[in-house]
Swiss-Prot record:
Entry comment, domain topic: The N-terminal domain has the RNA-binding Sm fold. It harbors the endoribonuclease activity.
Cofactor: a divalent metal cation
Pfam families per UniProt: eRF1_1 (PF03463), eRF1_3 (PF03465)
Biological process annotations from GO: nonfunctional rRNA decay; nuclear-transcribed mRNA catabolic process, no-go decay; nuclear-transcribed mRNA catabolic process, non-stop decay; ribosome disassembly; RNA surveillance
Subunit structure: Monomer.
Organism in which the protein naturally occurs: Methanococcus vannielii (strain ATCC 35089 / DSM 1224 / JCM 13029 / OCM 148 / SB)
Family matches, as SMART domains: eRF1_1
EC number: 3.1.-.-
Compartments reported by the entry: Cytoplasm
Function recorded in the entry: May function in recognizing stalled ribosomes, interact with stem-loop structures in stalled mRNA molecules, and effect endonucleolytic cleavage of the mRNA. May play a role in the release non-functional ribosomes and degradation of damaged mRNAs. Has endoribonuclease activity.
Protein name per the record: Protein pelota homolog
GO cellular component, one term: cytoplasm
Keywords of this entry: Cytoplasm, Endonuclease, Hydrolase, Metal-binding, Nuclease
GO molecular function: endonuclease activity; metal ion binding
Amino acid sequence: MKIIQEIPEKNIIKVMPENLDDLWHLSHIVQAYNAVYSVTERRTEDKGDKLRADRGTKRRVFLGIKVEKVSFHEEVNRLRVSGKIIHAPEDIPIGSYHTLDIEPFTQISIQKNWKKWDLTRLKEAEESGKRPKVVVVILDDSEADIFTVRDFGVKELASIKSGVSKRIDSKQNEQAKYLYYNEIITTLSEFDGKILFAGPGFSKNNIQNYISEKHKDLASKIVIESTNHTGRLGLSEILKSGIIDRIYGEARLSKESQIIEKLLEEISKKRLASYGLNSVKNSINYSAVETLLITDEFLRRNRSTVEEMVNSVENSGGKFVVISTEHDSGRQLKALGGISALLRFPVE
């Protein structure tokens, strides 16, 4: 995310999303009753051409809308923001409806009553854009699953079968193994930065040796880590281990996975954790909350309540973290009521 301009006296911040993660962040920043301004395409009627019976001509105009609906479309790399027009050229009626299609590198200005979590998310998005993409390959002798770890969740890029089998002879297995390695390497060729190979056994080490011999340009990017499982279970191990933070710098999804893992440990010990709205409020009243954990969904539904709780937590020296429900750890927090807290001391 690029923060282009801040106009505090008007509560306006002008930004430019640079990737899909940024659009996702904006989908949680922009909400109903905010004003959003951007250059967009709008179909306008050509009043001078009475003979034409079509729907008019599309042209690029600068519009402002009062937001009514926000929808994030991962599959088409787009954020759609709909509402009534509040600013437009003279020939476009104020109060008519329009949808802004916001894509990467679309500049928009957002006018709203900025909350702490909005500004925190905006700064996180700005920092996230400076880090390389996180690519993880979880593999064994039979299959490789390749993932990119985004701020809002995990996307599976490919699942590649090796073709190695006990039913074929050793020569055929050797050929199948190298085809397997090369298919993995081809999938990874478009990515810059470090690539994490992980899994049980020696497959990760074997492909590292092959790459070191045949693809020296790629060899320097590889990091090896062991897991007990393959597939998404193996990826979950990686996210909770902290290895991604050590390689790439602090990644949002890894950070969230680790903090929810710590929460669940404390809940199992029945000590330094509380969950559910009433229990967390009680912990806040005792100034016991070290870290307040809230899902993005809970925040959307309870903004005024959350704002009051965040202020109380920060006044007592605590902090808050908003957790995405787009990944497993966020869904675990959602199952606990969408709100929990790590505590400084136990509260009865």
